[in-house]
């Protein structure tokens, strides 16, 4: 299995929290399900197809602001109403994403990004992504006692005791009776420069930590 590393930039982004209606609150980083969805779009996956993968998400943003958008709501077949909604957005987002998958999957993601002509989004359809860096890692090692250098989601299986903001994030789903049943993972959102450290963690050849959401790639790979 290979690991692909991407450095992404977004001028603005809203990674909307579930069930936020009157106010569209955003996560501080994209949840795993959003990142997995982006990769499946890059892979041109057919409806219902799933490529097993493991994801690490970290990054920083310059600030947060809000604006009003018109929310359309459908009641029944014919009735449509609208209301203004406050949308929280992140400004100048820089992300580091690591994805681990079968060699063929990683090679296809890399090829489709490097040779692709389409624009990519992460979050809403209007949240465009600029890819500032992409490479398949050659050297990943386990290191000890590492500080948090970049804001990150740190899964519970890596460190239960670390201080941070608790989130229960969607990862993948199964459809039961036409309803998506999400698998979830408990994480802490930990900010840089908080004097928090992790005893053992994976680190790539550039010195960036890797916080995969699962000990093993889902589906047993």
List where the protein language model places each region:
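Internal, well-folded beta-alpha domain core
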Residues: 64-221
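N-terminal, Lys/Arg- and Ser/Thr-rich interaction peptides
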Residues: 1-20
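A generic structural signal for short, non-catalytic loop/turn and secondary-structure boundary residues
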Residues: 1, 48-50, 90
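Short, structured patches in soluble enzyme cores that scaffold and shape functional sites
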Residues: 8-10, 59-61, 99-101
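N-terminal amphipathic/basic helix or basic patch
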Residues: 1, 30-34, 108
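Primarily extracytoplasmic ectodomains and periplasmic/lumenal surface modules that are beta-strand-rich
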Residues: 13-15, 44-46, 105-106
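Glycine/small-residue-rich interface belts in oligomeric ring/scaffold proteins
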Residues: 18-78
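Generic beta-strand structural signal
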Residues: 4, 53-55, 93-95
């Amino acid at each position: 299995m290979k690991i692909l590393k991407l450095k992404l930039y977004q001028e603005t982004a809203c990674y909307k929290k579930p069930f936020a209606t009157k106010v569209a609150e955003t996560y501080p980083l994209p949840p795993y399900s959003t990142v997995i969805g982006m990769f499946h779009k890059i892979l041109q996956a057919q409806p219902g197809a799933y490529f097993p993968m493991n994801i690490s998400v970290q990054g920083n943003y310059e600030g947060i602001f809000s604006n009003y958008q018109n929310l359309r709501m459908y009641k029944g077949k014919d009735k449509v109403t609208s209301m203004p909604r406050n949308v929280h957005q992140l400004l100048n987002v820089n992300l580091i994403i690591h994805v681990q998958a079968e060699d063929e999957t990683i090679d296809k993601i890399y090829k489709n990004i490097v040779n692709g002509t389409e624009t990519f989004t992460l979050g809403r359809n209007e949240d465009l992504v600029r890819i500032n860096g992409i490479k398949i890692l050659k050297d990943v090692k386990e290191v000890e006692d590492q500080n948090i250098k970049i804001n990150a989601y740190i899964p519970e299986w890596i460190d239960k005791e670390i201080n941070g903001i608790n989130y229960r994030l969607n990862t993948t789903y199964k459809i039961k009776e036409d309803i998506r049943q999400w698998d979830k993972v408990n994480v802490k959102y930990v900010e840089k420069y908080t004097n928090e450290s992790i005893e053992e963690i994976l680190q790539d050849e550039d010195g960036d930590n890797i916080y995969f959401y699962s000990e093993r790639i889902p589906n047993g790979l």
